[in-house]
From Swiss-Prot:
The lineage of its organism: Bacteria, Bacillati, Cyanobacteriota, Cyanophyceae, Oscillatoriophycideae. Its EC number is 4.98.1.1. The gene is hemH. Fe cation binds at residues 196, 277. This is Ferrochelatase. One of its GO terms (cellular component) is cytoplasm.
Amino acid sequence: MGRVGVLLLNLGGPDRLEDVRPFLFNLFSDPEIIRLPVPWLQKPLAWLISTLRSRKSQENYLQIGGGSPLRKITEAQAEALEKRLEEIGHSVQVYIGMRYWHPFTEEAIARIKRDRIQKLVILPLYPQFSISTSGSSFRVLEEIWKQDPSLKQIEYSLIPSWYDNPGYLEAMADLISQELGQYSNPDTVHIFFSAHGVPQSYVDEAGDPYQKEIEECTRLIMKTLNRPNDYTLAYQSRVGPVEWLKPYTEDALKELGEQGIKEILVIPISFVSEHIETLQEIDIEYREVAEEAGIDHFQRVPALNTHPIFIDSLAQLVINSLTENSYTFEEITRPKKNMKMYPQERWEWGMTTAAEVWNGRLAMIGFIALLIELISGHGPLHFVGLL
């Protein structure tokens, strides 16, 4: 089989407060995060949003220690996975590729080439597939493969999602059981699954399978848990006025409070590592919402991090991927079924000189409009909630 590598894909996060603005710029520069009908606005808009949002984001990161722990946790996961694979007889080198901050995916591929890896398993640390997470990372890898002919020598296999993996479900159920054991009457605790949201249009118009996979994952976790508790699934991290997947976490918490629910256990279902959405958004912001709603006991299940059952489940995914037929990048980023990722041809400036000139003029007009809005504090971007 030759030298085998595993590439773990994740979002990335700012290590220090000074990293927050460039991290946000990278995030909002991704057309799978903000879909614009005119792509020449992507970079100016990303610059504007990252500039205006950086101070508030820095305050949030300051509440959790001044930076994201995601890189260190992902490195620990990679080390644990490599060790577990070695224990069961597989010599594998594990790499980390982050989408929006160091170590970037491009850096990981450079190390993979240097180490002369011949077989590569690409494993996103997102249990459920979304255009905006795994899909975006797969798109980057597809472009890297196109631009570097030497990578064609590497046989790769993709794992699009693994929300229904038995080991993953068992690890989640184990964490939930441990936390329920701290309540005096665990069977009456309301279990609250909070998933990262996406715009409703991603599901309705682009065919993103994320909502379906989240809902099925929730059902499977409860089946594996095998307890009588009532439960709710809601979606967090909404940005702007457009409709996202519902119910929203803050609204669902308020509704539970109105129903007289006093004890809830929050499950961060789409996160396998602690980061800003768990440590700050859930632990601080949503805790305040719950307390104001009259919920007396608000507790959260920790992220999986390096839970032994979870790491073993990742190892089994890798082993299975080495022997099974795999998807290609194109099958994921350009599927025949009704799923539409952002068309890359929209990034082309035009086929003629005249087209390029007019696009350039329009880009300049758009950029000037953004600057005017930045100075005045009024305009369409403020109206829709992006600024």
